[in-house]
From Swiss-Prot:
Domain spans labelled RNase H type-2: 94-310
Listed SUPFAM superfamilies: Ribonuclease H-like
Cofactor(s) of this protein: Mn(2+); Mg(2+)
The protein's name in its UniProt record: Ribonuclease HIII
EC numbers, comma separated: 3.1.26.4
Localisation: Cytoplasm
């Protein structure tokens, strides 16, 4: 598909939104200001000022607004600074425990951490089930694949609900430390489930340098043997991709529960649409309700409160 990306000011984005008002979509992707679908093109404008044009008329439509940015090279996985924790070159064919988390950047909803064990004999089946980087999958695909995975492979799931998350954060614990604790705990649980089966490697989708990760775990029993780290680990071994899919599935199920409790659909992400939803929740249930539904330390809390105050006046 032909595509083009331009960078414009927020005022230009407002002008674009007015221009395409007749073709705006009802919902927008995470982080987007608007999405429109004029003939032959899908236009998505983001809060960063970047605007993505896709479709046969992408070049012509983007030329109305600015010069396309040069396309960036696809980012590759980043290995940790300490080579001891870089995954082996042949890890893709090994029996591996993969660990990943979801929900850390979402204002509404919990943090879910999953580690999953994929024996090398199961790798062909993982591909057959459609296991791949969860960012390339839509929610209905995530749900379908995850429901097959949880019946097929050993895994450990931990859900850090919002009230507990907020309590830990208010006591001074960083999100990075929470993630380290949950990953280590999930891996420990799964190793117990495996009952003596030894994975050839443990691969964690890297969110901190290994030294920082292990420092967060001081004073605790740490799973360190054959443990490796890499960013974009979903593309390195299918165990991490499987863990990410199950974690995303769990997050979606938790969001459904929270939406039912709130009496409204709670959106993913942390953009302006989330501020609006949080303001609506404040007006409906009071500001104290946010503790149950959100990560309070996000800037969205103050923005939502201001919006709610404006709506009241």
């Amino acid at each position: 598909m032909s595509h083009s990306v331009i960078k414009v000011s927020l005022s230009a984005i407002d002008q674009m939104k007015m221009t395409y008002s007749g073709s705006l979509t009802a919902s927008v992707p995470q982080g987007a200001v608007f999405q429109a679908k004029p003939p032959g093109c899908t236009i998505t404008a983001y809060q960063s000022g970047k605007v993505l044009f896709q479709g046969k008329n992408a070049a012509a439509e983007s030329a109305r607004w600015g010069t396309a940015e040069p396309q960036e090279k696809k980012k590759t996985a980043k290995k940790p600074a300490d080579p001891r924790y870089a995954p082996p070159a042949d890890i893709a064919g090994m029996s591996v425990i993969g660990s990943d988390e979801v929900g850390t950047g979402d204002y509404f909803g919990p943090m879910t951490v999953v580690c999953a064990y994929v024996d090398k004999t199961m790798l062909p089946l993982m591909k057959e089930l459609g296991v791949k980087d969860s960012k390339d999958l839509k929610d209905p695909q995530i749900i379908e694949i995850a429901r097959n995975l949880i019946k097929t492979i050993p895994y450990s799931l931990l859900v850090l609900k919002n009230e507990k998350y907020n309590s830990m954060q208010e006591k001074g614990m960083s999100q990075g430390k929470m993630k380290a604790l949950l990953h280590n705990q999930a891996i420990t649980h799964l190793l117990r489930k495996l009952d003596g089966v030894k994975p050839e490697a443990i691969l964690i989708d890297q969110f901190a340098e290994p030294g920082v990760y292990f420092n967060h775990l001081k004073g605790r029993d740490i799973v360190k043997e054959r443990t490796y780290f890499s960013t974009k680990a979903e593309g390195i071994h299918l165990a991490v991709a499987a863990a990410s899919i199950i974690a995303r599935y769990s997050f979606l199920m938790e969001m459904d529960k929270l939406s039912r409790a709130a009496g409204m659909t709670l959106p993913k992400g942390a953009g302006p649409h989330v501020d609006e939803a949080a303001a609506k929740l404040i007006l409906k249930k009071g500001a104290s309700a946010l503790r149950t539904f959100t990560k309070l330390h996000f800037a969205n809390t103050q923005k939502a409160q201001r919006l709610a105050d404006k709506k009241r006046s």
